[in-house]
Each structure stands twice: as C-alpha cells, then as structure tokens.
C-alpha cells in the first residue's frame, strides 16, 4: 500500500501544470524511417555525423522468423544512413551480429543504442546465448562495441564485449532477474563518468555507473524509477539541466501503450513523470489504421523509443511497432518530429 501511494503521489505531482502541454503532445508523425524488404525491423537508434547526415543503427532479422522468437535467435544490428532526419534511409552494412560461437552473445544482437564519446562511437546492444529460453529470458546481457568510424570496424569492449550482467548479490532488487539485464540507455555524466540505464526485474529501470567508458560498470542496488507496472526501452538525455529518461508505459501509469518522460535532478532518483508519447492513433488518426497488420503485440503502439538530439534538444523520435500501419508483411520503424510550439 505504501509503495502504491508513493507512486500515485509522484504521478499526481508531476503532470504538467494547467495550460502546459506534456512532452507527448509535441510529436508529429512523419512516416516510415526504415522498411527493409524481407526483414522485420525493430529498435532504431539515431546519431548525427559532422556532415549533417543521420545514421540509424537498427535491429532487424529475416521475415520468415516471427517477431518472437526471431529477435532472440536471428536479430542483427544493421547500419543505415540518410541525408536528413526524415530519410530516406539507405542500408550500409551489418555492424554486429551474434557470434554463433560459445559466447554470451551467440545469438540475437538486438536493440542498439549509438552514441559518441570523444572521438569514438559507442554501440550498446543486448544479446543472449540460448534463444530457446522463454520470451524476455534471464540470459539477456548488455554489451558494448567501439569504433572511430560509424562504418566500423567495431571492437568489443574488454575481453568479450559484455559490460553488464545481473548482480550476484542476493540483496539487490534484480538478483536472479527473470529477464536478465537488457535494453540499454547511455549517458555521459556532465561531471565525469558514465551512466548505463537498463530494464530488469519487474519492468523497472536500473542504473550502473562507471568511471571509464569501457567499465567496470557497477550496478546500484535499487531501481531508479518508481513504478508498480512495467516500463522499458529507456532513452537517457539531459534537457534544461535535468536528467530525463524516456520509456514506454506498458500497462498504464499514464496510458497503456504510450510513453513516459521521467525527470530527475541527479540521474538516480526519477521522481517526476509526464506522458512521453501517445498511441499511434493519436498522431495519425483512426482512419489511417484501417489497413494496419499485426505482427506482434496487442495495442497499435510505438516500442523502443530513441531520440535524435540536435543542439541538445530532442528533435526526432524513432520507434518501431508490432503493427505495420500501412499493411506490409513485416514490421518497420517510424519517425516523428518534435514541434516546440
């Protein structure tokens, strides 16, 4: 009861003031970001290069494998590029794939997050060593690869690329987590060091910190979000001097199938929240969904939100969906534009 009341207090105190639009109200649907014939497409993480081109690192796998378990068994991370944020995006090369060997990342390189630190590009991803486990399995881990070029080659951090696994301390909140650690969100702290956010037990968001880019990453013993219903797929950034974490809202803290923008003063305690994005229908209208084809999931919603920041401000949102709203035979990722007004 105490936990439920504290969550309710957070949500009631953190809705935008009267007359102030939520983060979710600023998004405008543009269209498809990546559609690849013969492939399902999922998490699509953007980065801007020095020439103004936008690169997307995209989880994809052959269409003959269903979304689940295809993402666990056959996902790879492909690199696409466009002259601007709205595309069209062109395939360049496969950046990472499962090793196929007896390693922690034998299968399913998935849900990338791309960043730049100094003169190096940092590609975070998840993978597993046995796709026959149940959905959202305990053998998920987080890896890191680095390169001085967005076209690679990519060198795995440390001995084998793995930078985070579930804790071995039984007092930690996600000890023996049924879903491992997954879906990384990365932030270079303005005072030095690095923050690695992740989803784990109970659909809560956790945090691991490191002094050096390649680690070691040390997990905090408590979750950083206060939620009694699952969230996931965080994207971390700093805006107006505050730490922000954009996640999905799986079961309706605000609206089931929408998103949440969490806010924190220190990046550790996310005690304020507001709607981060809405269901797809809110941006395209019901009529545009009449030909939508379901490939995964229940609601027609966005998944794995990833932001493109320009001059430190969110400008574009890239997100896949279990539904192809245009009726195609595989999933695609979509792009939305942020309107400041």
Positions of predicted regions on the chain:
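Bacterial N-terminal signal peptides
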Residues: 6-14
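Positively charged n-region of N-terminal signal peptides that target proteins for export
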Residues: 1-4
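Carbohydrate-active catalytic/glycan-binding domains of CAZyme proteins
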Residues: 18-341
